[in-house]
């Protein structure tokens, strides 16, 4: 055909039946087919349209459009599509005709869903041409366009129809072209489009299933991707209309449903067509800041999901404002929103690394959130995220630190989760995470997890104790069968312990012996009681009583004691020999670890059997289940079984040859040392090894790091030998000769334990006499082993004092003259350390102070040996009195014994003085354990001991307090020492103050202390001690601010006491004791006055005067504090029903009624009462707001600087008075430093003044002549 030629339609057959000319269906079908084929071939630009007019009109006839034959309608639709194409751009039909045409087209589209219909080709042609020539857009201009559009979309979104995948793009194009012509698309259509993202997700279809693609979903994807600009506008409309409709409804549940669906849509769009999110991100941003909590919570959840979803775009960079708004939700006012934010973190951490910095900063806040649910969710992150991802993405040290702090969380659920989580995290980290330079700082925190766990025992909460027991053996120290690996894990755990954790660890293992013994007795009692003959015997009731006591004791340490008793009682009822055997085997002292593990697993497995009760025909009701019994036994076995201190570990611990790590070597030695103390029988199989080490070490001065040192071997063998005397062969001549040689010529520590071992031998006395002959007489100048020989004598005085009966006087006289009253080292050295540790005393460099310390200990042992003779032996009494004066002189003088006029030996080095006064205090406490010697410690001496509690040296305070607390808690010394503990009120060291406070709370709660009201009955003694504290004495003797400051200082001491002790239950008793003080005179004051007046007292006329006005003032302060506490805490105040006498060593009843009446007046000046009341109220208010320990933290930090500085300074030397001064009077004089009392106003009223506090040293110097009447030297027999 020539170019430009017009083509005319050749087809000329009628297609409409008339009455004159009927056309059969088949004929009509053929004609329409022919017409369609020719129309399809015509070109739009070169066709004579006039030739088409006839068929243009005929094709819209209802006879064709509504024909019953499917084929006729199919070909009619195809012809009409061609007509529209050829007439384009103008449609040759009216709106009504077009409406009918599109209805026909839609009916054909429906048939596309049935690929088996005979006209699928024509229908495919139809949809293709309508898209290709955009004829379909004519639908948008029709009056019924909305209805047609809705119907069109319903066709292709019908889930019951199966459209061929090859047409998805065509269908998407058709729908896209149509809605592009609509300014406003019906909401129903938009629902169809967007709901497909909610109802269909190809990623959720299980792999392997041959599932055809969903047409509606694929079309929605095409629409949103290809027509994103138009769809963005429609999405905005859809989102806003849905939200608007929902918010106008008061039904919150419906609103939540709508918001959840919309957010799911946004998430799916982000995963599939992320560019479309721009249309609604503004809504999300505003939802994050909405006043409606529901919107904020769900928007927060949505962003969290978006951040974890895979997408072609990076949300953080694309929508940075919204991301920042999401980050800010960690500070949302609603805890539910903060919880939602935190819950999204685990998945985010596991899927992306680019926002680690922001997450680290935010998470540091969630761990310290005010709401426990947020804190709990934060902890859960460590459970949900693999440990490797945690280490990779969480790098903020504050997060790990906060995790550890939550182990002491007050909310049980958070605390328990945290304890379990951090133990598990620690274990997983050890197994999977390599230590590198990059993660060094995090490891430093993680390494403290074992310490944190062991320190939880100090809380003394039974629930916490049980959980810590469980996590220790589940995660920290799992039941590893390999001995070497198990010990290595133990050393790793211990390698970063702090002091408190070590104490807790050692206490745990010491307790194991007691609990294992109790369980063994429980088994014995159970077997006895299960035997009817035994029960019928006379021993039956006795054993039953012991059995019940044992059950009570074992159950008392468990959180649910009732359930524990039920569990143990049920096991007894089982009367199963195998269970008894397994239980007994698990607590056997020398059971190998593998045997223990097998027995433990079998026992727990048996007890967890669901049919346990049925097997033994026991009915327990619902009170206890098999799992409860298993849990109780697990906890008891964790505590009673030799798991850590196991006999299988000893050989590994003793083998130091293959370990070059100095820290682990030290830990092994430390563990061995503790085992030798608490369970030396474990060395039974190693005694031969220890003896071999001792015999092979010919050179005691040689340092060998590949094995136990000689000192350690001797020490370990000695402690094992004390329990296993029969296991040590003292008949081994070579070995015994070695011990003799070590005792005579060796280093101090070696000498000490060699002598101790000799003292255990059958030939002890004979050998010690030989040693005595070798080392006496003492000669400081010529004796190379002088220090060692003092130790030998010290041990002989302890074990066989009668061996030295003839030499005692000479020894003591020599040591006083040549050691205590002379100095090998004079004055201070710039490079000298402030504190000499006990471990250094055996060093040659510190032999001078070592000699003095061991001499004091020798004196103590000497006093112990003569203690039984003191009541009836004047010489023993005199020596005891003078030795006690020596100890208290050292304490009062600060450790200086040398006169300032002694140019040769004065002064003693400051660090020597520090050590000596501390050692003297410790010796006093040791002697106080012996009743006959305790009587020599006077009330005025107790006041001097406050020196050590408030000493300028932290090691002195710590060492003395630890010994004091240990003796008091174990009730080894008199109650008169207890008030000393409460003079730590101004303790500047955080750790020491905290541990002391914990100790007070713990000891106060002990059953024996509660029953005996020990702490309550210490109040009069505390009042008396405060009244004699130099700060108080000096202040109360003054006027103005000094007087008021003394009162506020006393208030602080009393408040420190009442903060831990006072409660509703003991209030009446405490108030009664405070009042009772005024019913007595201060005996200490009277005794001092009597000493000063001397013989002239009888000549002077008697005056009615109460002794102890200062004591009455402190008593009044005590009453004021208690009344304020009563008011603040709403306590009831009833008169104490009993009558108690105050301690006779401190308080003396009035001789006359007149004297008693003088004490009834008020001693606190009325002008100061209001100020004092205000001071007390303010401080009590702070106590109620926070614990004493927390309240003191700021003060401690401020004081820490001064404390550190004070240790750098040389200790002041207090000068003794001259002999001439002594002759003028016997009164004591305080040192210069005591005259400058510290200001309580600084301590109590202002925080910035804390740095000016000076720790008081109550060191009053007295001349005590230890060389008087040399001809009358004391002889000890």
Curated annotation (Swiss-Prot):
<dbReference type="GO" id="GO:0042138">
    <property type="term" value="P:meiotic DNA double-strand break formation"/>
</dbReference>
<feature type="compositionally biased region" description="Acidic residues">
    <location>
        <begin position="1266"/>
        <end position="1277"/>
    </location>
</feature>
<protein>
    <recommendedName>
        <fullName>Sister chromatid cohesion protein PDS5</fullName>
    </recommendedName>
</protein>
<feature type="compositionally biased region" description="Basic and acidic residues">
    <location>
        <begin position="1244"/>
        <end position="1254"/>
    </location>
</feature>
<dbReference type="Pfam" id="PF20168">
    <property type="entry name" value="PDS5"/>
</dbReference>
<feature type="repeat" description="HEAT">
    <location>
        <begin position="393"/>
        <end position="429"/>
    </location>
</feature>
<feature type="region of interest" description="Disordered">
    <location>
        <begin position="1201"/>
        <end position="1277"/>
    </location>
</feature>
<comment type="function">
    <text>Essential for the establishment and maintenance of sister chromatid cohesion at centromere proximal and distal regions during S phase. Also required for chromosomal condensation.</text>
</comment>
<feature type="modified residue" description="Phosphoserine">
    <location>
        <position position="1231"/>
    </location>
</feature>
<dbReference type="InterPro" id="IPR016024">
    <property type="entry name" value="ARM-type_fold"/>
</dbReference>
<keyword id="KW-0597">Phosphoprotein</keyword>
<dbReference type="GO" id="GO:0005634">
    <property type="term" value="C:nucleus"/>
</dbReference>
<dbReference type="GO" id="GO:0000794">
    <property type="term" value="C:condensed nuclear chromosome"/>
</dbReference>
<dbReference type="GO" id="GO:0005829">
    <property type="term" value="C:cytosol"/>
</dbReference>
<dbReference type="GO" id="GO:0007076">
    <property type="term" value="P:mitotic chromosome condensation"/>
</dbReference>
<dbReference type="GO" id="GO:0140588">
    <property type="term" value="P:chromatin looping"/>
</dbReference>
<dbReference type="GO" id="GO:0006302">
    <property type="term" value="P:double-strand break repair"/>
</dbReference>
<keyword id="KW-0539">Nucleus</keyword>
<dbReference type="GO" id="GO:0035808">
    <property type="term" value="C:meiotic recombination initiation complex"/>
</dbReference>
<dbReference type="GO" id="GO:0007130">
    <property type="term" value="P:synaptonemal complex assembly"/>
</dbReference>
<keyword id="KW-0132">Cell division</keyword>
<feature type="compositionally biased region" description="Acidic residues">
    <location>
        <begin position="1221"/>
        <end position="1237"/>
    </location>
</feature>
<keyword id="KW-0131">Cell cycle</keyword>
<dbReference type="GO" id="GO:0051321">
    <property type="term" value="P:meiotic cell cycle"/>
</dbReference>
<dbReference type="InterPro" id="IPR039776">
    <property type="entry name" value="Pds5"/>
</dbReference>
<dbReference type="InterPro" id="IPR011989">
    <property type="entry name" value="ARM-like"/>
</dbReference>
<feature type="modified residue" description="Phosphoserine">
    <location>
        <position position="1233"/>
    </location>
</feature>
<dbReference type="GO" id="GO:0005198">
    <property type="term" value="F:structural molecule activity"/>
</dbReference>
<dbReference type="GO" id="GO:0007064">
    <property type="term" value="P:mitotic sister chromatid cohesion"/>
</dbReference>
<comment type="similarity">
    <text>Belongs to the PDS5 family.</text>
</comment>
<dbReference type="GO" id="GO:0006281">
    <property type="term" value="P:DNA repair"/>
</dbReference>
<dbReference type="GO" id="GO:0000785">
    <property type="term" value="C:chromatin"/>
</dbReference>
<feature type="compositionally biased region" description="Basic residues">
    <location>
        <begin position="1208"/>
        <end position="1217"/>
    </location>
</feature>
<keyword id="KW-0007">Acetylation</keyword>
<dbReference type="GO" id="GO:0051301">
    <property type="term" value="P:cell division"/>
</dbReference>
<dbReference type="GO" id="GO:0007129">
    <property type="term" value="P:homologous chromosome pairing at meiosis"/>
</dbReference>
<keyword id="KW-0498">Mitosis</keyword>
């Amino acid at each position: 055909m020539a170019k430009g030629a017009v083509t005319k339609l050749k087809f000329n057959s009628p297609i409409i039946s008339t009455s004159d000319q009927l056309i059969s269906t088949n004929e009509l079908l053929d004609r329409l087919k022919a017409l369609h084929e020719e129309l399809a071939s015509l070109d739009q630009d070169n066709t004579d349209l006039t030739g088409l007019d006839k068929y243009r009109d005929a094709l819209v006839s209802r006879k064709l459009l509504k024909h019953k034959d499917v084929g006729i309608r199919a070909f009619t639709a195809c012809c009409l599509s061609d007509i529209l194409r050829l007439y384009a751009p103008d449609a040759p039909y009216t709106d009504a005709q077009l409406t009918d045409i599109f209805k026909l087209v839609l009916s054909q589209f429906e048939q596309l869903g049935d690929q088996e219909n005979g006209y699928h080709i024509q229908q495919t042609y139809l949809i293709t041409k309508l898209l290709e020539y955009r004829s379909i857009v004519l639908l948008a201009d029709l009056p019924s366009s909305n209805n047609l559009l809705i119907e069109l979309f319903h066709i292709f979104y019908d889930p019951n129809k199966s459209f061929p995948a090859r047409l998805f793009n065509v269908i998407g194009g058709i729908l896209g072209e149509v809605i592009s012509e609509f300014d406003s698309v019906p909401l129903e259509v938009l629902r169809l489009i967007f709901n497909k993202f909610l109802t269909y997700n190809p990623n959720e279809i299980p792999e392997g299933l041959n599932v055809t693609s969903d047409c509606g979903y694929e079309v929605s994807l095409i629409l949103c991707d290809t027509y994103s600009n138009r769809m963005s506008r429609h999405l905005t409309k859809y989102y806003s209309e849905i939200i608007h409709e929902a918010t106008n409804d008061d039904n919150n549940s419906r609103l939540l449903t709508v918001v959840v669906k919309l957010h799911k849509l946004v998430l799916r769009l982000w995963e599939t067509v992320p560019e479309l999110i721009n249309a609604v991100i503004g809504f999300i941003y505003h939802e994050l800041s909405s006043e409606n909590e529901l919107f904020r919570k769900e928007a927060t959840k949505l962003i969290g999901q978006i951040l974890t979803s895979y997408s072609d775009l990076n949300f953080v960079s694309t929508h940075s404002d919204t991301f920042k708004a999401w980050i800010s939700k960690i500070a949302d006012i609603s805890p539910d929103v903060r919880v939602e934010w935190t819950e999204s973190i685990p998945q985010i951490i596991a899927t992306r690394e680019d926002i680690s910095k922001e997450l680290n900063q935010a998470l540091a806040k969630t761990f310290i959130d005010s709401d426990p649910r947020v804190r709990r969710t934060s902890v859960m992150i460590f459970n949900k995220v693999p440990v490797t991802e945690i280490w990779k993405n969480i790098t903020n040290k504050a997060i790990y630190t906060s995790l550890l702090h939550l182990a002491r969380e007050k909310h049980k659920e958070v605390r328990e989760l945290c304890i379990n989580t951090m133990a598990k995290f620690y274990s997983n980290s050890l197994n999977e995470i390599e230590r590198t330079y990059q993660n060094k700082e995090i490891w430093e925190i993680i390494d403290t997890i074992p310490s944190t766990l062991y320190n939880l025992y100090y809380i003394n909460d039974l629930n916490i104790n049980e959980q810590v027991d469980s996590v220790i053996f589940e995660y920290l120290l799992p039941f590893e069968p390999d001995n070497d690996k198990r010990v290595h894990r133990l050393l790793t755990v211990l390698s970063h312990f702090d002091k408190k954790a070590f104490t807790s660890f050692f206490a745990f293992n010491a307790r194991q012996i007691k609990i294992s013994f109790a369980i063994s007795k429980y088994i014995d009692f159970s077997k006895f009681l299960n035997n009817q003959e035994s029960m019928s015997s006379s021993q039956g009731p006795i054993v039953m009583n012991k059995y019940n006591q044992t059950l009570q004791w074992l159950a008392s340490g468990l959180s649910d004691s009732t359930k524990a008793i039920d569990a143990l009682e049920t096991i007894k009822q089982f009367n199963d020999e195998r269970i008894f055997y397994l239980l007994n085997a698990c607590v056997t002292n020398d059971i190998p670890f593998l045997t223990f593990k097998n027995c433990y697993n079998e026992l727990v497995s048996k007890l967890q059997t669901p049919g346990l009760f049925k097997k033994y025909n026991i009915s327990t009701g619902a009170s206890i289940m098999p799992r409860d019994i298993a849990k109780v036994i697990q906890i008891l076995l964790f505590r009673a079984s030799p798991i850590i201190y196991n006999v299988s570990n000893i050989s590994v611990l003793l083998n130091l040859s293959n370990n070059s790590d100095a820290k682990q070597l030290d830990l092994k030695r430390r563990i061995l040392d503790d085992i030798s103390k608490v369970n030396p029988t474990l060395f039974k199989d190693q005694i031969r090894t220890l003896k071999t080490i001792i015999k092979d070490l010919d050179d005691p001065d040689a340092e060998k790091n590949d094995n136990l040192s000689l000192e350690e071997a001797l020490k370990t063998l000695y402690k094992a030998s004390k329990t296993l005397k029969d296991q040590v062969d003292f008949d081994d001549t070579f070995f015994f000769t070695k011990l003799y040689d070590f005792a005579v010529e060796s280093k101090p520590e070696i000498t000490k334990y060699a002598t101790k071992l000799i003292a255990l031998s059958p030939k002890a006395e004979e050998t010690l006499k030989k040693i005595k002959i070798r080392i006496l007489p003492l000669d400081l100048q010529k004796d190379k082993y002088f220090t060692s020989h003092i130790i030998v004598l010290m041990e002989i005085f302890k074990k066989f004092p009668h061996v030295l009966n003839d030499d005692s006087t000479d020894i003591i006289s020599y040591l006083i003259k040549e050691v205590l009253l002379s100095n090998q080292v004079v004055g201070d050295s710039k490079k000298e350390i402030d504190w000499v540790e006990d471990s250094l005393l055996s060093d040659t460099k510190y032999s001078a102070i070592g000699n003095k310390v061991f001499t004091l200990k020798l004196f103590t042992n000497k006093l112990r040996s003569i203690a039984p003779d003191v009541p009836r032996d004047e010489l023993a009494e005199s020596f005891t009195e003078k030795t006690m004066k020596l100890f208290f002189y050292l304490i009062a003088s600060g450790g200086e014994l040398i006169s300032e006029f002694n140019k040769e030996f004065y002064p003693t080095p400051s660090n020597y003085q520090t050590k000596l006064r501390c050692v003297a205090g410790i010796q006093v406490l040791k002697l106080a354990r012996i009743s006959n010697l305790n009587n020599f410690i006077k009330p005025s001496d107790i006041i001097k001991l406050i020196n050590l509690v408030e000493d300028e040296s932290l090691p002195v305070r710590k060492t003395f307090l630890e010994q004091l607390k240990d003796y008091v808690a174990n009730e080894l010394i008199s109650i008169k020492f207890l008030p000393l503990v409460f003079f730590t009120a101004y303790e500047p060291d955080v750790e020491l103050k905290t541990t002391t406070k914990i100790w007070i709370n713990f000891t106060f709660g002990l059953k024996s202390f509660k029953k005996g009201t020990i702490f309550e009955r210490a109040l009069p003694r505390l009042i008396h001690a405060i009244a004699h504290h130099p700060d108080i004495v000096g202040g109360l003797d003054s006027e103005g601010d000094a007087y008021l400051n003394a009162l506020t200082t006393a208030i602080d001491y009393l408040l420190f006491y009442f903060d831990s002790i006072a409660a509703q239950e003991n209030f009446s008793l405490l108030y009664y004791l405070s009042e009772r003080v005024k019913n007595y005179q201060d005996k200490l004051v009277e005794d001092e006055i009597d000493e000063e007046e001397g013989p002239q007292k009888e000549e002077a006329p008697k005056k009615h005067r109460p002794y102890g006005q200062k004591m009455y003032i402190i008593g009044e302060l005590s009453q004021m504090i208690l009344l304020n506490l009563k008011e603040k805490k709403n306590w009831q105040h009833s008169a104490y029903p009993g009558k108690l006498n105050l301690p006779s060593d401190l308080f003396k009843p009035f001789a006359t009624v007149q004297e008693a009446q003088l004490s009834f007046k008020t001693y606190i000046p009325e002008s100061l009462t209001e100020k004092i009341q205000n001071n007390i109220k303010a401080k009590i208010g702070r106590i109620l707001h926070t614990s004493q320990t927390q309240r003191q933290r700021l003060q401690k930090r401020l004081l820490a600087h001064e404390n550190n500085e004070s240790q750098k300074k040389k200790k002041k030397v207090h000068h003794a008075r001259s002999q001439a001064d002594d002759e003028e009077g016997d009164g004591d004089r305080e040192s210069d430093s005591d005259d400058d009392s510290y200001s309580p106003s600084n301590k109590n009223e202002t925080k910035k003044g804390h740095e000016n506090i000076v720790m008081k040293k109550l060191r009053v110097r007295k001349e005590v002549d230890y060389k008087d009447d040399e001809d009358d030297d004391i002889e000890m027999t």
